[in-house]
């Protein structure tokens, strides 16, 4: 059975997508969150939308540009840091399940940076570390809902559901998979964890069933930082696959009402992770290089 996170009806919510083992960006997001706690008098929340783990193990000289800013995978350390942060701020730091986390608790094993990323990370962590990581993953929700209208998932809102109860009834065990490919056709979790896109009709149907108006998710890499799809969907890239200047996180007022994704404005709700590097189009402060 899966869990659905129900966010409070007031406070500031910060949203971070797809770190994939990038400790530097995790630490920067923690810094932003702790600044928000001060700014909003302790009433702030931080949500990670899955895929905190499974990054590259590549030397700098072999690093391809399409992976964005260089880093080395620190998945094990990041998960421990995430759990520590959640313990430090009870009820204010949350994580959603991504397809990469799911591989460690019954889902198909991913193979982006290794033939079997699940086996590799568990080998690195050892039995005790693996058990601890799995315990952390089991605390993660499949989706988050809010009264401000935003519904949060790892992947696109393409799943067919009739209510939030269908999300809560989803089987995460993987017991029915004959092969890893079966996940793609598995009701609810197949789409929520793996879908990179949803049609306008699919998104509207999902949001109506979940009681929301807009869908915010990651999973796919948006090199420009974010992409609005119609009135209902926005894909956000906070870390993985991007250069620092294009990394974006979301900052929302949980007491507000967001009717369309166009209510999310650059410089207000859509903010650069590294403002000193980001261009003006993302609300950044980077200085243009003058040609002499």
Kindly give the residue locations of the regions a language model identified.
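A short C-terminal boundary segment appended to hydrolase-like catalytic domains
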Residues: 269-292
């Amino acid at each position: 059975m899966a869990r659905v996170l129900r966010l409070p009806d007031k406070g500031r919510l910060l949203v971070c997508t797809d770190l994939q083992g990038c400790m530097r960006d995790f630490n920067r997001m923690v810094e932003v969150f702790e600044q928000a706690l001060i700014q909003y008098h302790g009433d702030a929340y931080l949500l990670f939308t899955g895929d905190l783990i499974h990054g590259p193990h590549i030397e700098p000289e072999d690093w391809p540009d399409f992976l964005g800013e260089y880093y080395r995978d620190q998945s094990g350390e990041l998960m421990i840091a995430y759990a520590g942060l959640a313990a430090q701020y009870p009820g204010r730091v949350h994580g959603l399940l991504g397809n990469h986390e799911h591989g460690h608790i019954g889902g198909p094993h991913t193979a982006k940076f290794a033939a079997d990323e699940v086996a590799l990370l568990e080998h690195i962590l050892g039995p005790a570390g693996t058990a601890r990581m799995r315990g952390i993953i089991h605390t993660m929700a499949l989706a988050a809902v809010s009264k401000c209208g935003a519904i949060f998932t790892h992947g696109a809102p393409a799943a067919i559901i009739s209510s939030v109860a269908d999300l809560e009834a989803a089987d995460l065990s993987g017991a029915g998979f004959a092969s890893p490919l079966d996940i793609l056709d598995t009701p609810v979790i197949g789409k929520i964890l793996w879908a990179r896109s949803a049609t306008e009709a699919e998104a509207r149907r999902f949001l109506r069933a979940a009681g929301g108006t807009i869908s915010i998710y990651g999973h796919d890499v948006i090199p420009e930082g974010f992409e609005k799809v119609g009135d209902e969907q926005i894909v956000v890239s906070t870390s993985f696959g991007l250069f620092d200047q294009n990394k974006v996180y979301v900052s929302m007022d949980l007491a507000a009402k967001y009717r369309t994704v166009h209510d999310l404005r650059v410089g207000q709700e859509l903010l650069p992770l590294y403002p000193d590097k980001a261009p003006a189009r993302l609300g950044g402060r980077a200085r243009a290089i003058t040609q002499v």
